């Protein structure tokens, strides 16, 4: 199993050292999230400070950006990292597209499928000189003069993964992408019963072996070197579970466990703006459905129980100031867990 860690994207000066430390600790990838900050620039600093780790956006919000703009970011990061950049894309929800980004909303699965195919066409144009001619319902690209082409990277074309929750986006991932980024708000039962069968079916439809397709995430990890650190990490996860459970769009994740009433109660509090203290509504038995929790010397075992056979890559947050030797050992222990995916190379 592969192990990733999130970069401190709010502090560009810290991104290079953090990525170098992750590489020294044996991590397979570092990732930059797009929440309050854009994810591409932090990875540029990480690229210049490392030689081995993958550099991943997890995820960049797609629709407010033209595929051409994203292609430029991707191409440059791939070039300067010598092929280590992985583009992770997500749609965000309608309200954020329309009200935060002022971006028109259309059927997201169909649009994302077209978005990824447009990116592939742009990549082929730049790498091989193939004429740029892409025409879809949402995007059209047919102008690429030599002056505006960055030219070939002489590398494998950049890998693309997408975030997916529903069946249409999961189908997109299997058909058009190099991997899928599952939502952290997921349980093992939900992935086993609903997500994995869909992915397997759609991969089979296009004749893709599972070893060529990366499944990332699908739950939380909470760990630490002391009982107090584990408790603090678990409480952060508890809050995130409550926050996501308050969103009706994620109610299907609660259904296999008979937790719809909990979701409805949290939705009422969310509509009232009462988020403070909502983590208290998440009992330990619900917390453990969504997360692998334990101290350093047990966390690999918990991750194997929670993610084994389903996920290829997990993201592990460590407490601030964690002992580097302990972190290296956890990474090695998790990497010993079998996984299906063989790598983007």
Language-model segments: residues:
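Active-site-adjacent structural elements that line small-molecule/cofactor binding pockets in enzymes
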Residues: 1-345
């Amino acid at each position: 199993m592969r192990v990733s860690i999130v970069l401190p994207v709010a502090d560009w000066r810290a991104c290079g050292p953090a990525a170098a430390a992750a590489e020294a600790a044996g991590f397979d990838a570092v990732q930059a999230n797009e929440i309050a900050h854009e994810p591409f620039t932090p990875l540029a600093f990480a690229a210049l400070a490392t030689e081995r780790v993958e550099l991943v956006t997890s995820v960049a919000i797609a629709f407010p950006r033209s595929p051409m703009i994203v292609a430029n970011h991707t191409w440059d990061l791939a070039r300067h990292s010598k092929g280590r950049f992985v583009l992770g894309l997500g749609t965000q929800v309608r309200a954020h597209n329309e009200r935060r980004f002022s971006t028109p909303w259309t059927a997201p699965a169909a649009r994302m499928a077209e978005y990824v195919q447009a990116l592939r066409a742009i990549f082929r144009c730049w790498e091989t000189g193939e004429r740029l001619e892409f025409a879809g319902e949402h995007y059209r690209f047919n102008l690429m003069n030599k002056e505006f082409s960055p030219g070939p990277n002489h590398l494998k074309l950049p890998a693309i993964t997408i975030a997916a929750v529903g069946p249409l986006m999961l189908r997109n991932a299997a058909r058009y992408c190099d991997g899928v980024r599952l939502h952290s708000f997921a349980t093992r039962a939900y992935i086993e019963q609903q997500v994995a069968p869909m992915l397997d079916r759609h991969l089979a439809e296009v004749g893709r072996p599972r070893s060529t397709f990366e499944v990332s995430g699908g739950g939380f990890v909470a760990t630490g070197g002391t009982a107090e650190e584990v408790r603090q990490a678990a409480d952060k996860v508890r809050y995130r579970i409550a926050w996501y459970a308050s969103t009706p769009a994620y109610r299907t994740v609660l259904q296999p466990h008979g937790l719809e009433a909990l979701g409805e109660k949290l939705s009422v509090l969310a509509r009232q703006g009462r988020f403070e203290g909502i983590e208290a509504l998440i009992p330990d038995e619900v917390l453990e459905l969504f997360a692998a929790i334990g101290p350093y010397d047990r966390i690999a075992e918990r991750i194997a129980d929670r993610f084994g056979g389903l996920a290829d890559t997990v993201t592990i947050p460590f407490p601030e100031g964690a002992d580097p030797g302990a972190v290296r050992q956890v990474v090695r222990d998790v990497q010993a867990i079998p996984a299906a995916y063989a790598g983007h190379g």
